[in-house]
Amino acid sequence: MSDRLTLLRPDDWHIHLRDGAVLPNTVADVARTFGRAIIMPNLVPPVRNAAEADAYRQRILAARPAGSRFEPLMVLYLTDRTQPEEIRAAKACGFVHAAKLYPAGATTNSDSGVTSIDKIFPVLEAMAEVGLPLLIHGEVTRGDVDVFDREKIFIDEHMRRVVERFPSLKVVFEHITTAEAVQFVKEASANVGATITAHHLLYNRNHMLVGGIRPHFYCLPILKRNTHQEALLDAATSGNAKFFLGTDSAPHAQHAKEAACGCAGCYSAYAAIELYAEAFEQRNALDQLEAFASLNGPRFYGLPANTDSITLVREEWTAPASLPFGELTVIPLRAGEKLRWRLLEDHS
C-alpha cells in the first residue's frame, strides 16, 4: 500500500464560510486544499440576488491568503419572493453557479427559506431554461416528523415531484445521509447528483450519543444509524459519477456549540481531504478518491477539472484542539485526535 497519494486538486461543492471577521480563517482553510468551492448563501441577511452574491464574493476574494488562486462559486438563496428575472440575471453574471432551496427552518439561518416548493415553480422553470443548477437541503421540517426521518420523507413528498416536473433541471441532493437518498440518486436521471460529507462517511449517531452527548458531531441533516453510513461509503467509493465531494463544513463559535441549545454544524475544512482519505482507505478505495473529489463535481457542473495537483502522505499528526474564528474559537472535527493522512503544502 502506497504511503503517498497525488490527486488533481479537488473542489468542495458545499461549504459555509460565514462572513465578516471570520473570513480570513475560513477562507484560508478551504483555499489550502481546494481550487474552487460552492459557497452557501445562508448569511443574515441571505444572498438573494446577483448583486448580493457579487458583494459577498468580493469579501471572500479579499480574504484569500497572499498568492491564493482559490475561486468562490456563488449561490443564490431562494425565497418565496425570488423572481425568474433574478435567476436570469444571476446566470448572465457568470459568477453565480447555482441556487439553493432551503425548506424554511431546516437548518442554520434558513428562516427566510421556501415555505412551499409549489410557490417557486416559476423560478425552477427559469432555472431549467437557463441551465442554473438547483441545490436542495432535502429535509421536511414539520414538527410531527422524527428528525431521523426528515430526509426519507422529503424524498417521498417533494424530491421525486421536483425531478419529474423539471426533468431538464440539474439538481444536487446535498449532504445525503440515508440509504434511501443513495438509491434515489442512483435511479434518477443523469441530471441528479449528490454531495456527501466526510463526517457522514466517518461517523454515525452512536459517535454523537453513546457515552455522552458530543455537540461537535451535531449537524443537520443529523448523523444516522450505521447502516446508512455504510450505504454512503458504498456510494462514495463506487466510482459512480453522480456522487461528489461536499464537506458542508459549517463553523460555529465554541460557545454556540457547547450550549444548552447548541448550533448544528461540523467544522472540517481545515483537514477535509485528509478525512475523506481515511474514509476511502477504510474501503480500500483510495484509487476512487480522485474521481469523487476532483472529477465528478466539475463534470456535473460543466466546468473543467483543475489542472494542478495535491499530494497526501501517510503520516500521523494531531488535529488542533481549537482554531481561530475571528476573535473567538471554533472546535474542529476530530479536535485533539490523530489523523492518518497529511497534506503536503505548496504542491501545485
UniProtKB/Swiss-Prot annotation:
GO terms for cellular component: cytosol. Zn(2+) 2 binds at K100, H137, H175. InterPro entries: Amidohydro-rel (IPR006680), DHOdimr (IPR004721), Dihydroorotase_CS (IPR002195), Metal_Hydrolase (IPR032466). It catalyses: (S)-dihydroorotate + H2O = N-carbamoyl-L-aspartate + H(+). Pfam families: Amidohydro_1. Homodimer. Keywords: Hydrolase, Metal-binding, Pyrimidine biosynthesis, Zinc. Catalyzes the reversible cyclization of carbamoyl aspartate to dihydroorotate. The gene is pyrC. It comes from Pseudomonas fluorescens (strain ATCC BAA-477 / NRRL B-23932 / Pf-5). Disulfide bonds: none annotated. This is Dihydroorotase. Substrate binds at H16, L17, R18, N42, H137, L220, H252, A264. Its EC number is 3.5.2.3. Belongs to the metallo-dependent hydrolases superfamily. DHOase family. Class II DHOase subfamily.
